[in-house]
């Protein structure tokens, strides 16, 4: 439920790879 398009890669982690 987070905007992975705006959060850093460290926050997205598994979502951004």
UniProtKB/Swiss-Prot annotation:
Inhibits bovine trypsin and human plasma kallikrein, but not human neutrophil elastase. This is Kunitz-type serine protease inhibitor D. Signal peptide: none annotated. It is found in: Secreted. Keywords: Protease inhibitor, Secreted, Serine protease inhibitor. GO terms for molecular function: serine-type endopeptidase inhibitor activity. It comes from the Eukaryota. One of its GO terms (cellular component) is extracellular region. Residues 1-17 form the BPTI/Kunitz inhibitor domain. The record marks 16-17 as: Reactive bond. It comes from Rhipicephalus microplus.
């Amino acid at each position: 439920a987070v905007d992975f398009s705006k959060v850093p890669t460290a926050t997205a982690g598994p979502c951004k790879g």
